[in-house]
Amino acid sequence: MNATDLKLYLVTHRYDDNEATFLAKIAAACENGVTMVQLREKMLSTRAYFELAQRVKLITDRYQIPLIIDDRVDICLAVDAAGVHIGDDELPVAMTRQLIGPDKVLGVSTKTVETAVAAVAAGADYLGVGAIFPTQTKANAPVTPIATLKAITAQVAVPVVAIGGVKEANLGTFKETGIAGVAIVSEIMQAPDIAHKVQALRTKLKAVLPNDR
């Protein structure tokens, strides 16, 4: 995969938005500089998830941004998304790779060096490490120390993104950590002005990511 796709990775969250507002937020983020979108829907039926994924993919395709589906291999394949992202309570990494084939992107959430190395060996294309900071979207998620993040980036040959409570104000924390990008939820999805927020994040990232110039 292209590691530059991971610079500013939007992970969606519906909050109380209706579908039109939700889609408009994704479109605004895509138009203004996010580089990848993950559709994460835990509560929808399979049919509703499929139909929403189709609508989101129309947006990401318009801006030529990869769409990743959280957890659901079936939805990923049904809408021909760029790939799927799985956590440690989903299908095993090797099985997921077998199901999606060699060409789709496979992202895996990890919290330790050991699980990171194992995920890469089993076929992960990139890793999401965190939660780095406390996060409202996963209130009980344990915090992963920056030292662990650095150790993971040093040990694996695939790109790593930091996730969990990432905000414009704490991006400086990630200097010299070796990450390829950051995954952000509420800082974008709940921003009063998404266009301005995404542009500000991209500007701030130029001082953080060594290859974002």
Curated annotation (Swiss-Prot):
BP terms from Gene Ontology: thiamine biosynthetic process; thiamine diphosphate biosynthetic process
Reaction equation(s) it catalyzes: 2-[(2R,5Z)-2-carboxy-4-methylthiazol-5(2H)-ylidene]ethyl phosphate + 4-amino-2-methyl-5-(diphosphooxymethyl)pyrimidine + 2 H(+) = thiamine phosphate + CO2 + diphosphate; 2-(2-carboxy-4-methylthiazol-5-yl)ethyl phosphate + 4-amino-2-methyl-5-(diphosphooxymethyl)pyrimidine + 2 H(+) = thiamine phosphate + CO2 + diphosphate; 4-methyl-5-(2-phosphooxyethyl)-thiazole + 4-amino-2-methyl-5-(diphosphooxymethyl)pyrimidine + H(+) = thiamine phosphate + diphosphate
Enzyme class: transferase
UniProt entry keywords in alphabetical sequence: Magnesium, Metal-binding, Thiamine biosynthesis, Transferase
Annotated Gene Ontology cellular component terms: cytoplasm
Residues at which 2-[(2R,5Z)-2-carboxy-4-methylthiazol-5(2H)-ylidene]ethyl phosphate binds: 135-137, 165, 185-186
Note on how the cofactor is bound: Binds 1 Mg(2+) ion per subunit.
Binding site for 4-amino-2-methyl-5-(diphosphooxymethyl)pyrimidine: 38-42, 70, 109, 138
UniProt cross-references to Pfam families, sorted A to Z: TMP-TENI
Cofactor(s) needed for function: Mg(2+)
Family designation: Belongs to the thiamine-phosphate synthase family.
Protein name listed in UniProt: Thiamine-phosphate synthase
Species in which this protein is naturally found: Lacticaseibacillus casei (strain BL23)
